[in-house]
């Protein structure tokens, strides 16, 4: 009786015309990026940072982040891609790793701030809430592709969590219902976004960089536990790579936060002085 609610999976293709195919995955990711950019520009204006700096940063960061995200994924799936090299560039089918994108964007930000004489800590504090918002939105691309899911479960169990039927139906994959880990991470990210925006508007209580460090710890903490429920984790032997990185990032951010608290780091300020 429970399985009577099963419906066909949603079409991952948004638009198709001639040789051109646009996937929902790309549309959703792009929407998250655009919203993040608009929010960063708004927050940057409050700190006296010209909006062109954010456009210029994105111009460099976006392609490099995508490349790094894909490289990260391919490296840890090399046993497959070494046999299917033509699929290495097929990012429209999914297969990018957020940690790779974050690392790529972070490196670009440090270089960009150096040459623009901007405070890297201030820029990271501005970008952190927008980034986790984009991450929360982007997880719905995984939903459309029926990926980033967890172990086998039952429809009754999903209904008991008050998950809408249209999400439950999409979680019917390969003849089984799956734990919607994409949903858990999306909700975790969007909750983190609300928290970080609250901190941004109470920044007088913080030192420079602490909002960004809070983002790192928040995301790493949630990702560690959610990753443990997934069945498609990138592995290094028996170790889930994302869980390992989550531990490294959480501990590193906590140590940096403690060190900066014990140093004579100025409390939050307005302005774009380089530090």
Curated annotation (Swiss-Prot):
It is a multi-pass membrane protein. GO terms for biological process: lipoprotein biosynthetic process. This is Phosphatidylglycerol--prolipoprotein diacylglyceryl transferase. The gene is lgt. It comes from Limosilactobacillus reuteri (strain DSM 20016) (Lactobacillus reuteri). The keyword Metal-binding does not apply. Keywords: Cell membrane, Membrane, Transferase, Transmembrane, Transmembrane helix. InterPro entries: Lgt. The chain crosses the membrane at residues 20-40, 58-78, 88-108, 118-138, 209-229, 239-259.
